Every structure is written in structure tokens, then in C-alpha cells.
UniProtKB/Swiss-Prot annotation:
Palmostatin B inhibits its palmitoyl protein thioesterase activity. It comes from Homo sapiens (Human). This is Deubiquitinase DESI2. Its main location: cytoplasm. The active site is at 30, 108. Has deubiquitinating activity towards 'Lys-48'- and 'Lys-63'-linked polyubiquitin chains. Deubiquitinates 'Lys-48'-linked polyubiquitination of RPS7 leading to its stabilization. Exhibits palmitoyl protein thioesterase (S-depalmitoylation) activity towards synthetic substrates 4-methylumbelliferyl-6-S-palmitoyl-beta-D-glucopyranoside and S-depalmitoylation probe 5 (DPP-5). Interacts with RPS7.
Length: 194
């Protein structure tokens, strides 16, 4: 294995909402795991591919205007190499698909905790995901939350790129099929007399 790399939880305050929720003891936070100078996070979108995305560590502006960097929490260290971490994130992407996002059961903080457990054997602090706990007690709470909370700006551009790539692949495949059928049609064929 490689060098001992710090595993850091970057926590973001959804500050305009926290003006209201902090008075009742519930913060609304987004989180991501930083390792090897890269930050991995998870968000929802309506498609059946990975909702995991990458941003510059601690850069709240990449998440959107409703986010503000709150703090970095050192969770531990890992001996995984950077290539190993990419494979781990890719595997987690099969479970953390965009259309599987759920505020109570599978949100960004659940992802951060899962990745942290794999990398350094520790869950994230409980206070970061307190909203999920309370919303499981008050089911209608999720329907009251703005849709943009589910899909941070950084993920929206990642999803747009993924969809653009899929469209280009489909167009390339269609063009190849068209060229192949045209070429096949211009080949001399067998002619038989009846």
C-alpha cells in the first residue's frame, strides 16, 4: 500500500436554510470526503448512473450559491493509493446512483460516511446528518425542501456532461451503422436467375 494520506470530511453549511433550522437545533449540511487533494461527494439527479461527483476541496462555490464552507474534520488516514480510491468511488457509484438519492436513507452524508468507513474505518460525526434522522421522524419534511437541495450545481454540470457523452456515443453508433449499411448496399451482390 502507499503513503498514509489524511481523510478529511469537508462540511458545508446550507446557510440560508440554517437561519431557520438552527433555532430548533437542526443544521442542514452537505459533506464530501477529501483525500489526495480531491473531494468526492454525492447528490441526486433523475438518471440511473452515479451521483458521485468531484469538486476542488473546500470550494463551496462549485456546489452553488446556497452553500458555504463550514469546517474540515480530520477523520483519520488511509493507506489506499489514489488509483485504489478511484476504483472504490467507481464501485460506490453503482450503489449511489443519482436516482437513488433519498434525503432520509441515502444522501450526501450517508455517502461520506460509507466512503470514510472504507478508507479509514470511521463514520462521520452524527451531528452532520441530523436532518436525515429528524426527517425520518417527520416524513412530510422532505416534500417541503427545495429541489435544488437534492442536486448541487457541481453535480448538475457533471450530469449534463454524462448526458452529452451518452448522446455523442449514440450519434457515433448511428453514424457507424449508417455507413456500414450504405457500404453493404453498394457492394456487388449475387444475382441469381430463376
Amino acid at each position: 500500500m502507499g503513503a498514509n494520506q489524511l481523510v478529511v470530511l469537508n462540511v458545508y453549511d446550507m446557510y440560508w436554510m440554517n437561519e431557520y433550522t438552527s433555532s430548533i437545533g437542526i443544521g442542514v449540511f452537505h459533506s464530501g470526503i477529501e483525500v489526495y487533494g480531491r473531494e468526492f461527494a454525492y447528490g441526486g439527479h433523475p438518471y440511473p448512473f452515479s451521483g458521485i461527483f468531484e469538486i476542488s476541496p473546500g470550494n463551496a462555490s462549485e456546489l452553488g450559491e446556497t452553500f458555504k464552507f463550514k469546517e474540515a474534520v480530520v477523520l483519520g488516514s488511509t493507506d489506499f493509493l489514489e488509483d485504489d480510491i478511484e476504483k472504490i468511488v467507481e464501485e460506490l457509484g453503482k450503489e449511489y446512483k443519482g436516482n437513488a438519492y433519498h434525503l432520509m436513507h441515502k444522501n450526501c452524508n450517508h455517502f461520506s460516511s460509507a466512503l470514510s468507513e472504507i478508507l479509514c474505518g470511521k463514520e462521520i460525526p452524527r451531528w452532520i446528518n441530523r436532518l436525515a434522522y429528524f426527517s425520518s421522524c417527520i416524513p412530510f419534511l422532505q416534500s417541503c425542501l427545495p429541489k435544488e437541495w437534492l442536486t448541487p450545481a457541481a453535480l448538475q454540470s457533471s450530469v449534463s456532461q454524462e448526458l452529452q457523452d451518452e448522446l455523442e456515443e449514440a450519434e457515433d453508433a448511428a453514424a457507424s451503422a449508417s455507413v456500414a449499411s450504405t457500404a453493404a448496399g453498394s457492394r456487388p451482390g449475387r444475382h441469381t436467375k430463376l
